Amino acid sequence: MARVTNSPASRKRRKKVLKYAKGYFGSKSKLYRYAKEAVQHAWQYAYDHRRKKKSDFRALWIVRVNAACRNAGISYSRFMEGLKAANIALDRKVLADLAVRDEAGFNVLVKQAQDALKTKAASAKKA
């Protein structure tokens, strides 16, 4: 009895991997053995970086808010503490967008944060 190799499915699978590896340099785009490895690494990097992207954006937002805070004469940590004391629940993404697009609106938030810090300090002295 003849050996069954399921050749059409094997060829389709290999062609699919080589299609994913299109644009890779040298043997990684030509030879199935190396293309498969390169594609698997690429998918692993893609998976990891989809998760890393979230922390990268958070860090970018913090840098932008910090720069705007320094221009307004307050440190980032004091600003965030003041927002919390003033019960202003804006996330860093929105704050960064305000800092870049609406400087006047951001300065209003800075003023509110500074006022909340003053009232917090005054209530701490009384207690």
From Swiss-Prot:
**General function of this protein:** Binds directly to 23S ribosomal RNA and is necessary for the in vitro assembly process of the 50S ribosomal subunit. It is not involved in the protein synthesizing functions of that subunit.
For this record, the Gene Ontology CC terms, alphabetical, are: ribonucleoprotein complex; ribosome
Q: Fetch the InterPro entries from UniProt.
A: Ribosomal_bL20, RIBOSOMAL_L20_CS, Ribosomal_protein_bL20_C
Judging by the UniProt lineage, the source's domain of life is Bacteria
Q: Which HAMAP family match?
A: Ribosomal_bL20 (MF_00382)
The record's annotation in Pfam families points to: Ribosomal_L20
Q: What protein am I looking at?
A: Large ribosomal subunit protein bL20
Kindly list the GO molecular function terms attached to this UniProt entry. rRNA binding; structural constituent of ribosome
Source gene?
A: rplT
Q: RNA-binding: is it a keyword of this entry? A: yes
Biological process terms from the Gene Ontology for this record are: ribosomal large subunit assembly; translation
Classification from the root reads: Bacteria, Pseudomonadati, Verrucomicrobiota, Opitutia, Opitutales
Record keywords:
Ribonucleoprotein, Ribosomal protein, RNA-binding, rRNA-binding
State the organism of origin: Opitutus terrae (strain DSM 11246 / JCM 15787 / PB90-1)
**What family does this chain come from, according to its entry?**
Belongs to the bacterial ribosomal protein bL20 family.
